[in-house]
Regions:
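Hydrophobic/aromatic-rich transmembrane helices and adjacent perimembrane loops
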Residues: 42-51, 260, 385, 389-423
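Short aromatic-acidic-glycine turn motif
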Residues: 495-505
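Membrane-interface alpha helices of multi-pass inner-membrane proteins
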Residues: 199-206, 221-223, 239-267, 299, ...
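Alpha-helical transmembrane segments of multi-pass membrane proteins
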Residues: 173-176, 214-226, 241-244, 257-260, ...
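Internal/C-terminal transmembrane anchor helices
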Residues: 76-87, 422-451
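Short beta-strand elements
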Residues: 547-575
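Primarily membrane-embedded glycan-assembly and transfer machineries that use lipid-linked glycans
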Residues: 1-77, 84-213, 217-222, 231-234, ...
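Membrane-interface junctions at the ends of membrane-embedded or membrane-associated helices
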Residues: 3-7, 62-65, 228-243, 270-284, ...
Length: 575
């Protein structure tokens, strides 16, 4: 006679999820252990114990007989992940440019000095490993460009040490709190997914160690996004609803990424509540949520709005207005890597904004279908932006998980969808498809305009001065402006996806008139430019201009290197 399985036996998918979370803890752990074993033996011992915990957890995940036992194992996996995160932080907490700027902003705040609009070049002079953000006008962004919540949280911790330590403590602590919050709010069988996404894969802890303010915003958004269609159910917010609205306002006061999520969330809440309660009550619910969020945002920003209104306004909007050089993994790579540039870079920004608006409109029109993807849709627009770095996508991925687990499609079954007469007739399916296509056409058209642009400057390297077999001290370049407007060129050399600092033009006109040529003598930002010896390295001479924003590039050969050079008529070996 067959024996019936235990009624309390965990589901197989729960076992697999716990096992995957356990396996994810191996990612990057060996490198941290190797680093610790050479100088911090206590941390190395703790990491070794974490290895033991991982192995034991793997066995128990496959052999636990009761759901409660597996749930306790999920807690053990979370604690192991938190321990590994803290061990890694103890070894690597110097911070990146965001962390360094945040810590300096906190110091200025504690000293009673202005925070916004103040350039701090010495931060980057004394930290050569900290990245600079170059701008299209040939300069760098050396000021603080985020809302003030994270400096306010960092200021009380400045006693911990110099550098960016206080800022990275805040962001790493926020990540741990966010991971625990998401773990606690998810249904029991799904909790290991929170461990895996927040801590296991390693990319979010690395951003936290760099001091990214977006990590604090993420932690504040987690309680907002979990079961978000229930906010205002029955027309009542209650203390929980007001608390979530306050978290939304605080997240917007920590970093700018939540600004893009807010319209989508509010539109989704309005649609769900209108389907339940009607237009007037739904509008009242959204108005109260907005009011609570704005109140918290204003409270956090009030001191800066009063003490430095102009610089505060320009500072918090800086990522949107700084006109940084193009960079990222999105469509802008066409101009960076696959062509010789474009004279229509601004159209990528137009396309990104139009796509964001189109996606918001599509969410409103098709909320019953797109509602579960509300926390993912805003980030799609960044794929077309001039700064389409993958951090804009992955920093908010825990919100994707929260929505996937807690906001099923059934939550939107009765949501209101606007259906004017031309979308509700006998041919409504064709009309809806046509409307969706028309909403996307402007963004696609702008993308096509940007992608088909041509480089406005033609270049030819005529001489390269060297001080050694692989050291270039000066380049001479002949530049021809083929555009109809005068351009102010700014030069740099790249050997990969990043960008080195600007080269100095010691000879040549600052502005090159239309349809003219000039010779420029360029010197590297350091004493020399080291030519990579690695075979296949691609060296590109890039020229950026502002007003209009353009990029002109060419592959070059330099003495002493073994580079792959694109077959291009302007590419000639330096003599």
């Amino acid at each position: 006679m067959a024996v019936a399985p235990e009624a309390d036996a965990p589901a197989q998918w729960h076992r697999v999820l716990t096992l995957l979370a356990t396996v994810s803890l191996f990612i990057g752990t060996r490198a941290v252990w190797t680093q610790a074993a050479s100088r911090e033996l206590v941390i190395a011992a703790v990491i070794s114990l974490c290895y033991l915990s991982i192995l034991v957890s793997g066995v128990l995940a496959l052999t636990a007989r009761r759901t409660r036992t597996l749930a306790r194992l999920d807690l053990c996996v979370l604690l192991t992940a938190m321990t590994l995160t803290l061990c890694t932080f103890a070894l690597n907490h110097a911070g990146g440019d965001e962390g360094v700027l945040t810590a300096q902003a906190a110091r200025e705040l504690a000293a009673g000095h202005p925070v916004y609009g103040q350039p701090w070049p010495w931060l980057f002079q004394h930290n050569p490993d900290v990245a600079l953000t170059p701008t299209m006008n040939g300069g760098y962004d050396l000021t603080y460009g985020y809302p003030p919540l994270v400096p306010l949280l960092t200021a009380p911790l400045l006693w911990l040490g110099h550098g960016a330590l206080a800022a990275t403590v805040v962001t790493t602590g926020a990540l741990l709190v966010g991971a625990v919050t998401l773990w606690r709010l998810l249904p029991v069988p799904w909790r290991s997914a929170a461990t895996m996404v927040c801590l296991g894969f390693g990319f979010l802890p690395s951003y936290a160690r760099l001091g990214y303010p977006a990590i604090v915003a993420l932690a504040l958004l987690i309680p907002v996004v979990v079961r978000w269609p229930r906010i205002g159910a029955g027309g009542r917010l209650g203390w929980g609803g007001f608390a979530r609205a306050a978290c939304l306002g605080a997240a917007c006061a920590a970093q700018q990424l939540p600004w893009f999520l807010v319209p989508f969330l509010l539109a989704g809440i309005y649609a769900v509540r209108r389907g339940e309660l009607g237009a007037r009550t739904a509008a009242w619910v959204v108005l109260r949520i907005t009011g609570a969020a704005v109140t918290v945002w204003l409270l956090i920003n009030t001191y800066f709005m009063v003490s430095e209104p102009r610089t505060w306004a320009s500072g918090v909007a800086l990522p949107l207005t700084q006109n940084a050089t193009i960079h990222g993994q999105g469509l802008v790579g066409l101009a960076l890597y696959y062509t010789d540039g474009s004279d229509r870079l601004a159209w990528y920004s137009h396309a990104s904004m139009l796509l964001a608006g189109a996606l918001l409109a599509l969410l409103v029109l098709f909320v019953r279908r797109l509602g579960p993807a509300t926390t993912v849709l805003p980030w799609c627009a960044f794929f077309l932006a001039t700064r389409s770095q993958d951090g804009y996508y992955l920093l908010m991925t825990p919100l994707w998980l929260a929505a996937a687990v807690t906001t099923p499609a059934t939550s939107f079954a009765r949501a209101w969808q606007p259906r004017p007469r031309f979308l509700s007739g006998p041919r409504r399916r064709a009309a809806l498809v046509a409307t969706a296509a028309l909403l996307l056409v402007p963004a696609l058209a702008c993308t096509a305009v940007a992608a088909t642009g041509s480089p406005p400057l033609a270049m030819r390297v005529t001489r390269a001065l060297t001080t050694g077999p692989t050291a270039v001290s000066e380049l001479t370049v002949r530049v021809t402006n083929r555009d109809d407007s005068a351009l102010t060129p700014h030069f740099t050399l790249t050997t990969g996806q990043g960008m080195t600092r600007w080269w100095t033009a010691v000879q040549g006109p600052a502005t090159l008139p239309a349809h003219t040529s000039a010779v420029y003598r360029l010197q590297p930002p350091g004493p020399v430019f080291r030519v990579p010896r690695r075979p296949g390295t691609r060296i590109r001479l890039r020229v950026f201009t502002a007003s209009p924003d353009t990029l002109s590039s060419m592959d070059i050969r330099l003495p002493g290197g073994r580079q792959n050079v694109k077959d291009h008529p302007a590419v000639r070996p330096a003599r």
